[in-house]
Regions:
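Bacterial N-terminal signal peptides that target proteins for export
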Residues: 1-9
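Glycine-centered loop/turn positions within well-structured domains
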Residues: 3-4, 48, 132, 314-315
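Bacterial N-terminal signal peptides
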Residues: 8-17
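A generic structural signal for short, solvent-exposed coil/turn residues
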Residues: 13, 31-33, 80-82, 102, ...
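Short linear motifs centered on Gly/Pro in flexible linkers and helix caps
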Residues: 19-20, 223
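Active-site-adjacent loops and short helices of periplasmic peptidoglycan-processing enzymes
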Residues: 21-182, 188-193
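Domain-terminus/edge residues, biased toward the C-terminal soluble/receptor-binding domains
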Residues: 161-165, 173-316
Length: 316
């Protein structure tokens, strides 16, 4: 049987909004060689970094920006400011034909005057990576793109993302916009934890809207051996090819971030390499708190009917 390293999980859970530092393991495990500008492999349960390269390097996130766009929308839903069933009237600023910056970019293909639910716009943002869907949501939630970007950056601070600043709601190249593999892993962890009603959308393989069917660009969703259920791809000329993939193996979830790969296939291969390595070399185990009761067991023919179970409290 192959030896594994164990990631300790305390019963005293830490907040997902905390920033976690990379950890050195006491046992030498050779990480895979990754062909990308930067990368991170994170254990979801603990937030522990299993391997990383240039993880704090500020890079263009491209459409990985949309993870924060979706996160802000979900926070607005959680605070009851909007609902998934709200109907949004699409404005001209979300129309690709009227916005040259959208030429050649990913779209949901909205038109001015379209009436679309927040739920469908969220699906268009996640599955189609629709820049127009991002603008429509930003207008509805915050009254405009600049106001929405301000909200995005407020959550950057709340999540302690030290390497991140946003200038757009969609991720197209813009001066001053940057993030890191580490920060995007932390954001992905927050999304998985905090958006149970939305996260299933990240595994949706296609979306048909207005008679147009588009495939999710995350090719790992089709790999039946990996159990990948999200999260997002991104690409611009300045960013290269980015991918965040999360996979579940038994009770363990891993998050792989790859930034600046050289092709769509390359980003998938590098993310898969990280996930396979983590699954083969690590297990997550729970460390019980000293003196903490974790259950009871019935006793037959004893002087007590049951006994409490848990670690023995030690001293010194």
């Amino acid at each position: 049987m192959k030896g594994r390293l164990f990631i300790a999980v305390s019963l005293l859970a830490a907040s997902v909004s905390c920033a976690f530092a990379a950890n050195d393991f006491p046992v030498n495990v050779t990480p895979p060689s990754i062909q990308a500008g930067s990368w991170v492999l994170m254990d979801y349960t603990t937030g522990q970094i299993l391997t990383a390269g240039n993880e704090h390097q500020q890079r263009n996130p491209a459409s990985l920006t949309k993870l924060m766009t979706g996160y802000v929308v979900d926070r607005a839903i959680d605070s009851h400011r909007i609902t998934f069933d709200d109907i949004v009237t699409v404005g001209k600023d979300a129309w690709a034909q009227g916005n040259p910056v959208f030429n050649g970019s990913s779209l949901m293909f909205l038109k001015p005057g379209d009436r679309v639910s927040v739920r469908d716009l969220s699906r268009g943002l996640i599955v189609d990576s629709g820049n127009d869907a991002c603008v429509a949501l930003a207008d509805y939630v915050a009254g405009g793109q600049p106001q929405f970007v301000a909200l995005m950056n407020s959550y950057v601070e709340k999540l302690h993302l030290q390497d991140t600043h946003f200038e757009t709601v969609h991720g197209l190249d813009a001066p001053g916009q940057h993030s890191s593999a580490y920060d995007l892993a932390v954001l992905s962890r927050a999304i998985i934890h905090g958006e149970p009603d939305v996260y299933h959308m990240y595994s949706q393989k296609s979306l048909t809207w207005n008679g147009i069917t588009q495939q999710n660009r995350n090719g790992l969703l089709w790999d039946k051996t990996m159990n990948v259920d999200g999260l997002k791809t991104g690409h611009t000329s300045g960013a290269g090819f980015n991918l965040i993939a999360s996979a579940v193996d038994g009770q363990r979830r891993l998050i792989a971030v790859v930034m600046g790969a050289d092709s769509p296939k390359g980003r998938e291969q590098q993310a898969a390499k990280l996930l396979h390595w983590g699954q083969q070399n690590f297990d997550t185990v729970q460390v019980l708190q000293d003196g903490k009761q974790v259950g009871v067991e019935r006793i037959w023919y004893g002087d007590k009917e049951q006994i409490k179970l848990g670690p023995i409290r030690t001293s010194g």
